[in-house]
Design a protein with these regions (language model features):
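Thiol-/selenol-based redox modules, centered on thioredoxin-like
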Residues: 131-146
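Cleavable N-terminal signal peptides
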Residues: 8-9, 19
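Electrostatic cytochrome c docking/interface patches
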Residues: 16-36, 47-48, 146
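Bacterial N-terminal signal peptides that target proteins for export
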Residues: 1-7
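Short cysteine clusters
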Residues: 39-42
Length: 146
């Protein structure tokens, strides 16, 4: 592969790049509500949502990782939050295909590879790009983000 192709791929992977800026703009909240039904085994969302196997996701966008009140997070999630992980559309988009790999890479990139151990409680992976955009649009309906 040519050097410039690597540079383009690397730039596209950066949070805040045009590729990630399109995340919330390309999602359909109504379709995201349908996708979210897969998440309801572990999560709830809405004004009366309670923690289950996973934390309630009301207000997740803009929240520091590992800080939903009353939820017992994994050490990996808490470490990511303590080292600056605040959930945004872009970061959730990157997280959903492989939560463990994302958190470990986040901590390693922050210079904390010694904290990138263990695993998150989230075993589910959502790889489909459009479904991720849709579910993020749905999450935004329950966010204070303006």
């Amino acid at each position: 592969m040519h050097y410039y192709a690597y540079v383009f791929i690397a730039a596209a992977a950066l949070p805040g790049s045009t590729a990630f800026a399109q995340v919330s703009a390309g999602g359909d909240a109504a379709k995201g509500e349908q996708v979210f039904k897969q998440c309801m085994t572990c999560h709830r969302i809405g004004p009366d949502a309670k923690n289950l196997v996973g934390p309630a996701l009301t207000g997740v966008i803009g929240r520091q990782s590992g800080t939903a009140p009353g939820f017992a997070y994994s050490t990996l999630n808490k470490a990511a939050g303590e080292n600056g992980l605040v959930w945004s559309d872009d970061l959730i988009f990157q997280y959903l295909p492989d939560p463990n790999a994302f958190l470990k890479k986040f901590l390693t990139d922050k210079g904390k590879p010694e904290l990138a151990t263990g695993s998150t409680k989230m075993a589910f992976k959502l790889g489909d790009e459009q479904q991720r955009k849709d579910v993020i649009a749905y999450l935004n309906k329950f966010s204070d983000k303006k």
